[in-house]
From Swiss-Prot:
Native source organism of the sequence: Francisella tularensis subsp. holarctica (strain LVS)
Record family assignment: Belongs to the RbfA family.
Gene that this sequence comes from: rbfA
Cellular compartments annotated: Cytoplasm
GO molecular-function terms, A-Z: ribosomal small subunit binding
Name of the protein in question: Ribosome-binding factor A
Keyword terms of this UniProt record: Cytoplasm, Ribosome biogenesis
Amino acid sequence: MAAEGRVQRVASEFQKVISLLLRTRIKDAKLASATITEVDLSKDLSYAKIYYTCLAIEDAEYIDKAFEKSKGFFRSSIAKSLSLRIVPNLKFIYDTSLDYGMQMEEKIQQALEADSKIIKQDDKSLQENYKQNDKETKAEKLR
């Protein structure tokens, strides 16, 4: 249990260090625009999956290649910043959860709009039924 807490703390520090490096030390504007969303470390701290996202989806492939080329820089910078016996192997992965969330949000909005149209149609039908019933009731009273 304590090991899991340590892994989470180290992962949090990794995220902070890499984010800081992206903001301060990376000169490539596209790569610097990436946002680190999560760091997943193995229990023995030998492997790190670093999830990132970027505003321009079309830049994702370029950024992936740039991260791949910059692995050594990030590993050495992490080694200097954090006191770890072993600096993990880094794997940068594009985080699709934001894109997925946006797609889900769009589908929800479409469903809400469709529901709204159905409700409006049902309201019109009900109003017409009430009017028809009122006319019939008035006609019966007049007889």
